[in-house]
Amino acid sequence: MKEKALKKEEELLECEKLWIFAVMIAVGGFFGAYTYVQKGGVFCNAQTANFVLMAVQLGRGNWCKALYYLLPASAYLLGTVISEFLPKHINRRKIVRWDTAFVAFEMAWIFALGFVPDDAPPQICQVAVNFIASMQFNTFRQAKKIPMATTFCTNHVRQVGSNLVKWLRSGNKEARGKMFAHLLMIGSFVAGAVASTFLCGYLGGKTIWCAEILLAIVFFALLRADLGEEHDKLDVVPHGH
């Protein structure tokens, strides 16, 4: 039984391991709190709120304000398109995987964001975070072959409830494992948001740079795998893609 579980774990790429996703969703929580506390009181990790706000403005007849929300939505769409288009070309070069290249790009992106002055229009950072959050969401899709989001918690909450019922009803150990995996993701998201909120009180707009620590941990783990034990698997497509 132990050998079977070990073999199953070995089948996973480094970018599909649960701890990688836990760190990445902590980054997602960090971004969410950062834009809410520091950049205009909005959440930029997903688009549902933007469409609700656009609908509210349309209902009030504020056409110009409504049209603004097409900007973050378009940035999110663009992030998805780019992160769908580039992996094939990056992986074909067989130097590093797309996942690794993306984390390096994300580090550079938020490093640049840290230079945006605190008195600049918050929409600059909002749209920029929309873009990078979209790319992160689309790049990291499954951990341990379980569909996972790394920028928001809605599906994780649903999956906790669903798998809890399956576990209690039939004693399904796989459902129990999935439940705890989703709980870990929620906890990591909250931890990232708490840290971001605390740091914003001291560092202001520069707080975004602290996310570099988490991203660096992921980047070097993925890079080591790409250059080492997974170098002959650079053309293997992660589950969910």
Model regions: which residues?
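Alpha-helical transmembrane segments of multi-pass membrane proteins
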Residues: 2-241
